[in-house]
Amino acid sequence: KAVFFCAARMSKFFPLQKAAQFFLLLIRGTPLMLQLICVYFIPGLLWGFSFDRFVAAIIAMSVNYAAYFAEIYRGGFESVPQGQREAAKVLGYSKAQAFVFVIVPQVIKRIMPAMGNEVITLVKDTALVTVIGVVELLHVAKSASNRVFSTVPLFVAGLFYLIMNGLVTFVFACVEKKLSYYK
């Protein structure tokens, strides 16, 4: 989805570019919690059917994060100097070859830190799905905490989030290190 939104946003076709720009503004400009509520409740109000809670959560979070990733990708593509494309052309690369072998590797290297941040935020934002009734880690910890009159389950949940995000950080650090071939 993010690649499609990025391509639409960078399109030379003005109506498509403006539609993508508006859609990305709409998604990035509204809270994820509101998007979760809308995806779960609005189809039932308008058309008489509703998504399963888990499916609604996946749809809302996928679209939300696709919008953020699309802007990260766009920034990555726009950060590659025009001279790189010209150099690839001089070397005899076709546009497709230049894109695959010259542009994309530079984009991936440049967007890794921002992508890592978004994935960490995604892990933490999973706690928001409880607003539409999806049972997730923090909800279970809160219920357990209320049952046993202790904050220990909440600290355990926090520790789990910390471990998950530590793993995400480690993986992205390894990828970044692998991509920093000039150091």
Feature locations, PLM:
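Transmembrane alpha-helices and adjacent helix-loop boundaries
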Residues: 1-183
